[in-house]
């Protein structure tokens, strides 16, 4: 709760090893309202800065929040799923540790991919090494495989990412191109 008010208080929660118990509650707690409180708390920690978000990403919190958000119909309350989605959005929008976001490119539905691709579009232009790593890891190819509706925010983000790579590279990694 205190993480919501100030970035230094959120960092104090991180330094005092508060992420692990919150993540554990998110995964193992049988009561949805406690899971929802844990999701909300994790989102409050991650919303302050890229450093805060990196700690959460390194602890695999985004993947856990995504798993909760994507629970099957009838599992998990609407409140839990809503809080998980909001926490995931808060963390993604601050996360500049792109390698931690790459697994979400495979697992996330399009509404979450919109936030993930927006982060890549924001961070990749300033980081040449990240662009190379993005290609080598398969993340760039995965971006090309996303089925995004024309005119959607997701499509805009993908186009923004592609604009920072040579056209031949984009074509090479696009589906249907023989290698």
Feature map (PLM): residue ranges:
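Alpha-solenoid helical repeat architecture
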Residues: 26-30, 69-73, 105-109, 147
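Eukaryotic acidic, Ser/Thr-rich intrinsically disordered low-complexity regions
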Residues: 139-179
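Short, hydrophobic/charged alpha-helical patches characteristic of ARM/HEAT alpha-solenoid repeats
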Residues: 8-16, 33-34, 51-60, 75-82, ...
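Disulfide-stabilized cysteine-rich extracellular repeat microdomains
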Residues: 18-19, 27, 31, 61-62, ...
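Bulky hydrophobic/aromatic packing residues
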Residues: 5, 48, 54, 147-148
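Buried hydrophobic core positions in alpha-solenoid tandem helical repeats
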Residues: 21-24, 64-69, 100-104, 142-144
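Alpha-helical solenoid repeat architecture
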Residues: 1-6, 24, 36-48, 67-71, ...
């Amino acid at each position: 709760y205190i993480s919501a008010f100030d970035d230094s208080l959120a960092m104090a929660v991180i330094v005092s090893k508060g992420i692990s118990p919150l993540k554990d509650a998110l995964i193992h707690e049988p009561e949805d309202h406690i899971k929802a409180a844990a999701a909300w708390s994790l989102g409050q920690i991650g919303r302050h800065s890229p450093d805060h978000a990196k700690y959460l990403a390194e602890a695999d919190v985004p993947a856990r929040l995504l798993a909760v958000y994507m629970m099957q119909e009838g599992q998990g309350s609407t409140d839990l799923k809503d809080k998980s989605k909001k926490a995931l959005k808060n963390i993604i929008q601050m996360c500049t540790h792109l390698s931690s976001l790459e697994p979400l490119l495979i697992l996330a539905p399009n509404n979450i991919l919109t936030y993930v691709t927006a982060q890549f579009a924001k961070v990749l232009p300033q980081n040449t090494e990240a662009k190379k790593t993005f290609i080598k890891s398969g993340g760039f190819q995965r971006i090309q495989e996303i089925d995004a509706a024309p005119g959607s925010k997701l499509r805009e983000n993908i186009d923004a990412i592609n604009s920072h790579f040579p056209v031949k590279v984009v074509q090479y990694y696009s589906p249907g191109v023989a290698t």
